[in-house]
Amino acid sequence: MTKLVSTTYSENLDCRRLNVIFDLKEKDSNGNDAFTIFDESFNINVMIKKDHAVQISTQAIIEITNIDRELRNKLLAAFSLYKERTLQAPFVPVSVEIGRKSSQHLRRVFIGAVVTVDASMPPDIGVRFTCAESQNDRTIQIGTGPGTDIPQTGSFQDLCQYCADQLGLELVYHEELVAQNIQVPSYNVPYALSSLVPMLMSYNSFKIAAYIDDIYLIIRPFANAVNGPIYDINAETGMIGIPSFTESGVSFKCLADIPIPIAGGVRVTSIRNPGLDTTYITSGVVYRLESRGNEWSSEWKAYPSVLTVD
C-alpha cells in the first residue's frame, strides 16, 4: 500500500491534511504487506464529483506533480497492463481522506479504483489519475434468472439487503421505511449487478431514492434526509461566497472538511441573499482540493426537503 501524505504549513492556522492512498498490493522481503508513506514535497490536486441522481456518477481526478523519477515510475508501473493484470481485475483501489492537523481522525471523501493514468511530459513531472467508485464488478452476471435463495415475495428491506450483499456494500435503510414495512408482491432479480440499483429506483410508487455513496447503499424516502445532524452553513461555519438559486433549489460553496453527506440536511443562512434561508437536502457535490494551493472547497447542490417524486 502506498500512502501520499500532504499537510499545509501555517504557524497560525489549523493546517489542512490531504491523504491519497493507493493499494498497490506491495510486499516486503518477508512476504508481508508493505506500507509506504512518501513525504510532503509534491503537489496533490484532487477533483471529486458526486451526484446521487445517477447511480454510477462518483468520480475523481487526481493530479500529482513535483515528484521524483522513482515515485513517478513506480506509480506508472503499477497501472501498466501486464499479462497478469489483463487476466485479473486491472483496478488499483484508491481512497482520498481530508481533515485538519488538530483532528484525530480524517474523513474519507472518496473510495474507488484507478481507471486510467496519464504521465505529463517534462519539465513538469507528474501523473494524472482518473478514478471511479468501487463498483468495477457491477457488470458481473449473477445468474440466468432469479436464484433459489431469493424469495419471490417479501419485504422491500429484504430485497435491498440482498442487493447490498451482492454489491459488497453496507445497507443504510431509512428508519421511516422500516416503520412502513413495505411489502413487495413479486420481483425478479436482474441478471447483472449493474441493474440492481436502477431496479430499486423503479419502485417510485413508494417515493424512494436508492443510490451508492462511499461503501454504502442508501435507501431513503426522496423527501427525507439521511439520518444525522443538520449542518448550519453560514459565514461563521465555513460558507464561501454567496449562495444562489437553481432550478431545483440552491447551490452554495463552503470549506471542504465540513462533514456534509450526500442527501444530508443543511440549514443555509446568507446575509447577502436571505431569500434562500431554509433547510435543504443535498443532492450533489464537487470537491476541489489542493495540497499546495488555495483551493479547499466543496460546491453543493441541494433542494428543499418538501420536494417529492411523482
Positions of predicted regions on the chain:
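Short beta-strand-centered interaction patches in the first periplasmic/extracellular domains
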Residues: 116, 121-138, 167-244
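Short solvent-exposed strand/turn elements
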Residues: 125-142, 294-310
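Generic recognition of cysteine residues
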Residues: 15, 131, 160-163, 254
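Amphipathic, non-transmembrane alpha-helical segments in extracytoplasmic/periplasmic proteins
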Residues: 61-64, 71-79, 143-171, 188-212, ...
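Assembly/oligomerization scaffold segments
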Residues: 1-129, 293-295
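Short beta-strands and strand-coil junctions in structured, solvent-facing domains, enriched
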Residues: 69-70, 103-104, 137-138, 203-209, ...
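An acidic/polar, Gly/Ser/Thr-rich interaction patch typically located in mid-to-C-terminal regions
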Residues: 48-49, 53-85, 218-310
